[in-house]
Amino acid sequence: MAKNRNEIPEKLTWDLTTIYKTDKEWEAELTRIKSELSLVEETDPGHLLDSAESLLTITEKMLSISQQVEKLYVYASMKNDQDTREAKYQEYQSKATALYVKFGEVYAFYEPEFLKISKEVYNKWLGELQKLKNYDHMFERLFAKKAHILSQKEEKLLAAAGEIFESPSETFEIFDNADIKLPMVKNESDEMIQLTHGNYSSLMESKNRGVRKAAYKALYSNYEQYQHTYAKTLQTNVKVHNLNAQIRSYDSARQAALANNFVPEKVYDVLMEAIHQHLPLLHRYIELRKKILGITDLKMYGIYTPLSNLGYKFNYEDGVKKAEEVLAIFGKEYKGKVKAAFEQRWIDVEENIGKRSGAYSGGSYDTNAFMLLNWQETLDDLFTLVHETGHSMHSAFTRENQPYVYGNYPIFLAEIASTTNENILTETLLKESKDDKERFALLNHWLDSFRGTVFRQSQFAEFEQKIHEADAAGEVLTSEYLNSLYGEINEKYYNLAVKGNPEIQYEWARIPHFYYNFYVFQYATGFAAATFLAEKVVHGSTEDRQKYLEYLKAGSSAYPLEVIAKAGVDMESTDYLDAAFELFENRLSELEKLVEKGVHL
């Protein structure tokens, strides 16, 4: 049973006094920054391009205030996350969020004003004022957007329409999470319980086929019933993306979304090409699953059934020890930072009443790279620990080696650092496995992760691309059209006929990622790149490990593909994907051999 916050040993809580010693200090900073923003509002708009010195001064002031706002926000947010019932910290978070909004409003002038400068004048100023070169890559990114920025009047109109453009995704979220009441179903104890989005996953992992089937059919009966409403929200959302792309002179919504993060479209195309080429591997995995479960007719509700009963148990101390041992492979510098994170209270470990669920790595440029966990002593908790430590090490290395302006990194790169660690942990545990049953469990765990991240997220990415293209070509995205398209893609991926799995055609209706605007493909590219890099780190040279650290240290000082190239990955080539699929095939072959030996019985 979860404890109250004050019952958790101090050593298992994060130390937020390293950010602000007291709440009063936070409150004083909030007041001071509000005043500073009011002053900026009166003095800076309209003067950015008065001179090279003015551009430098206003830019540095903006970045400095941004740095302070982030620090304030992080403290309030983490204080709230550790016990969401505390009204004081709910209020702190609201105030910090309002400050973020105010900062955005005050500096709304910056980008449109900067884009009035010609490249000739900018280059002249760059030659005259050496310090401007510290921000050259930031300015270069702004220039890259210039062709897609509208007049000040048009930008103002678009900004005013922002709330309207957000309404399809907000309507979906409210309808799906608040308005819809899912049916009652039986759990493994034969008790009637309320089906929720939260408990659906655990019910789908039940060893009782009847429990899985009932939960699956109950969930999708909801999406079948309301399919026309879900189709309308998704269709409108796609229209918003396509309209924005058209207004800003992009060729497509996909081009607009990827250009925003400076990721070439070729990365997406290369992923799709490699996925389609390697779908027979997923079909092989599905066939093996049938064999292990002893059935010839696998249903979609059998995809998540656990294939192993082996239960790993790790208390937190053992988990930390194992994580330190596994991550030592990166060398002295990385090892030292991991030690600091584990010993200097960067981590909030245990579950307590009111604490935010799940796990994350957080912090700001001026703080430790904190981690929130909810440790339950499972193998998944150990994987979560090395995953979040990967994010935190990425943050720590970036902040130590880059100025604030480049002291962050995009999601496109973020998931690589975390899942590389997960892959190295898998490699280590496989090496240490004592018998075939352990190997079976570990191989199954990794293959399921690969399937769920690389294959499944690519399936979503393919559907997302096709519905945007269809709308742009004048197709009406009715529920019938969406059902048919999704069912066809699902059948192609899993080799399981829609006829025998009619409910799966409605799955598109429950995926929130389809409202995120070409976001989901990054999970697949990230996991594949991490698989490729983990092999280089484990089996490669000291130079390979050093190159990996260079990627962690680069932050956003270069474009994403240039940064990951430092580690040795070319995201516009299929090489990294082919290497990842080769490992998937090798591990699948090993699992097949273990099944032949009867290890699963």
From Swiss-Prot:
Coiled coil: none annotated. Binds 1 zinc ion. GO terms for biological process: peptide metabolic process; proteolysis. Zn(2+) binds at residues 387, 391, 394. Pfam families: Peptidase_M3, Peptidase_M3_N. Transmembrane segments: none annotated. The keyword Transport does not apply. Its cofactor is Zn(2+). GO terms for molecular function: metal ion binding; metalloendopeptidase activity. Hydrolyzes peptides containing between 7 and 17 amino acids with a rather wide specificity. Belongs to the peptidase M3B family. This is Oligoendopeptidase F, plasmid. It comes from Lactococcus lactis subsp. cremoris.
